[in-house]
Curated annotation (Swiss-Prot):
Superkingdom of source: Eukaryota
Annotated Basic and acidic residues bias: 112-125, 243-256, 360-371, 395-418, 774-791
Pfam families the UniProt entry points to: LsmAD (PF06741)
One cellular component (GO) term of this entry: cytosol
Composition bias, Low complexity: 76-96, 473-486, 715-725, 734-760
Changes seen on gene knockout: Impaired RNAi-mediated heterochromatin silencing.
GO biological process, one term: stress granule assembly
Record-stated family: Belongs to the ataxin-2 family.
Protein name as it appears in the record: Ataxin-2 homolog
Ranges of compositional bias, category Polar residues: 1-22, 326-337, 487-497
Organism (species): Schizosaccharomyces pombe (strain 972 / ATCC 24843) (Fission yeast)
Cysteine pairings via disulfide bonds: none
Encoding gene, per UniProt annotation: ath1
InterPro entries per the UniProt record, alphabetical: ATXN2-like, LsmAD_domain
Amino acid sequence: MATRSVSMKQTSQRAASPNKTQGAKKWSAVAARGSKIAQSATNDHRNVESIKVVPENRVRGGVAAKATDSSSNVTSLASSEENVSSVSGSAKSNNSQQRVWKTDVAISAEKRTETRQRELRRWMPDPEDAGVPLAGLEESTDNVEWDQFATNEKLFGVKSHFDEDLYTSRIDRSHPKYKEKEQEADRIAKEIEGTVTNNIHIAEERGLKVDDSGLDEEDLYSGVHRSIDVVRNYTRSNAYNKNNKDQKPKNHEAPHQHPQQKVVPPDDPAIVSHRHLALPRAPGPDSRAAERFFNARRKAGPLSRREKEGQIKEFMQFSQSLKIGSLDSKQPSSTKSVAEVKVADEKQLPDASSQATPADSKEPRKEEAEKPVTSATEVSSEKVEKVDGNTSSPSKEEEKPSTEPEKPSVVTQRKETTGTKLGTKLNAKAISFKPNVAAPVFTPGKFTIPSKPAPVNASRPMMPQQSNNSEASIPSTTPQSPSVVSNGENKPSSSPVFFNGPVSSEKEPILDNFNVFKNVGEEHQGAEQIDKPFSCPPTWNTGPNSLQQTIANSRPEGNSGSAKKAAAANPMIPSIVLPNSAMPSAMPMYPTPTMPYIPVGYPVPGYTPYMRNPSQHTSVAPSPNGTPTSGNSSTVGSPMIGYMAPQFIPPYAMPQFPPSGNGRGASAPATYFVPQMGGMMAYTMNGVPPMYGQYAPNNGMMNMHYPMYGDSRRSNSQRSFNSSNGKRSNVHKNNNASNTFSHSNASTSSSLNAAPNTTAKSSSQTAPPVSKGDATEKTEKDASANQEAKP
């Protein structure tokens, strides 16, 4: 049995050997904490392995006990392995948590979850505490005032430096008007407290009883404005409802009942002084003031009506007494009233005329009062002329008999009084408006004649042909002035006076002349207006007068014709324009019939002509401006094909072509130059440069180039273009004589002359006609000779 048990122990230990190996691997990864545990586990493993080699004969008497001890060691080893694994796992988890990378959103989310507040719950009193009143400072029975600063200093030792004057206005009680200001403040406070409020908190501060059943702290003391209907349902006070004290709110079926609190108002001086007063049940001072106001209006109503009626009657009487006439001249409605006034005026006019002296002290004042009369007559004269308009002819005026001989004086006096009335405001009770029959008539020296036409009856002078014989026989007691002349007839005025005539609708307000918007609008309407872009159709109207046609048909203005005529009459001698210089302003751009033409590129003394490199003809047509293109491949400056060559004009009846030295006939024209080597100047046959004006006008020009300035000094048409690869090439070389004469013109190849130099022949000899090859060899020889002859 013992042997069998030992073998079983061995098999169990062998089965557990893989776990030991895994535990050993884990221990190697653990730091200082698992080192001791690993050592103990290794020792136990050695003990277990030693049991395997124990002989069978020795497994007696305590071997089983040893095996039992070893098995217990194995069990402890397994438990230690679990502990080590747990320790290593926790260490790894801590390291992984520390090494996790988090974003700001994740960190803020964790902070929100950590600092998240708990859900607020509504406080509900316990059932057993429902009848207990809430304690407050107002319920203290002692009369000792509570001082928060003294309490803090007593309990916490904090001494306050609070100064009330820093936060409120300081009251100066020693001011002499302090009592008056206090009474005024008390009155304002009572007025404020007498107003009706829907705020429960304000009502509570005023000492009113508030039924707070069904209301919480938010409803009572919150600053949120609730609807008026909701607040009224919970508000109970003496000012709002007196008969419904026991009425409960309908919105709450079983409100939580609290005992009524004893409300004590704060110790404010404005409230303490009138604490014994209740809310005003009767209408306040506002209602009394309103009653007094309405009573005053009722009493003032009849008085105002009487005053208005009296004023209207006075104006009516005044207008009737001053009535001049209606619009219809056939109905003299005011004849009697005018006659009565006339009789009274005749009695006092002699006295008034005798009293009128230049030294009268009242006269300056009357002149000042008469000044607005002139302006009134000037304004009314224009309207009278428009309405009246010479309705009655002179013949009708002659037919009417003059029944009242004294009408001229009456009309003049009445017009004077009317002018004074119209010049000022209409006030019936004013003394200045009453007719003053004693007023003297102003003399012509003291009365200014108005520049504008005056009314017909008073200020219009009578023409000689309109005067009647009866007028001459009427004696006049008053001196008539030029501006006040009567025609012997009571001609009714068409100007409306007060209530007799219709109000003229032609009167324009004076303020409109000073209206900025009106004036600017009139100027804008009178100015030429251009249609807005959005008001134009998408297609423009085209025609001979349209803007597009006008611009297209326009020509630049200038006296170009006179300039042409002046240039033709006085032709100027053309001068040579050096490179990199401006063209003379007086020189015309094109030759006139009387002006010889000098082609561009005329040889300048000191410079050699630039010869073109031979190139093939291009397909480009000749330039319309007369400038040949680069297709002209010539060894000399010959014109293009199709253009007239420049002809040499001999001066003063000399032969056109000088005789040649060899007697073979005329040589090449002197205008064709033979290229010279070594920078020598090419001249004519006799070695003298041609004179100015020896070129006949032609349609083209010679292609002469300036080698010292390079290709940049040439025009675009003179630059060669290689048609093979499409790129410009600067292959113009002065010393490449073989290329220069390889493609020479047929007209000049037969008559080329050698250039004069120190080693060549004399200029009088002429070279015989040679072929292209001979010419090339000869040119190369001349070039080498020229180079040797250079200093």
